[in-house]
Design a protein with these regions (language model features):
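Short amphipathic alpha-helix that is part of the acyltransferase structural core
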Residues: 1-29, 33
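Conserved beta-hairpin
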Residues: 28-45
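Acyl-donor binding region in acyl/amide transferases
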Residues: 35-37, 48-127, 132-135
Length: 136
């Protein structure tokens, strides 16, 4: 399924991300969505201040992606590219995202992002190891 970019209201993007990740991104800067040919939103990306304090240097943004949950396969690498371009045009020099090790990071790979670090599981979140991915 191919997607095209559509604007999304901040509150709608946050609600979608909260349903998937159970956490609201803080310090939101922008959001963008991907819709199918029928105009239905399939995936959302929210760019915000990094959750890791060491990355919160004023020049880095973190992007959280969330599928709407329709069950259909989604090709959202255009969202990765759009977020990178938007962040660059706003003056940010680094863009990162996290991918759980039990999930595929093929979308990030197809968009040219690369894994730069692995993070151990956080206390209270179960045995979830994540990889830090960085935009080119």
């Amino acid at each position: 399924m191919s997607l095209h970019l559509v604007p999304v209201r901040d509150r709608d993007a946050v609600r979608t991300v909260r349903l998937r990740h159970r956490r609201t991104p803080r310090g939101r800067v922008f959001a963008v969505a991907g819709a199918d040919d029928d105009g239905r939103v399939r995936t959302v990306a929210v760019a915000h201040r990094p959750t890791a304090g060491l990355l919160d240097d004023g020049t880095t943004l973190e992007v959280t992606f969330a599928d709407v949950g329709t069950g259909a396969p989604v090709e959202d690498s255009p969202l990765y590219t759009a977020c990178r371009r938007a962040a660059e045009s706003l003056g940010y020099t680094r863009l990162v995202t996290y991918a759980r090790d039990d999930e595929s990071a093929a979308r990030a790979r197809r968009a040219g992002w690369r894994a730069s670090a692995r993070r151990r599981a956080r206390p209270g979140e179960g045995p979830v190891v994540v990889s830090l991915w960085q935009a080119p």
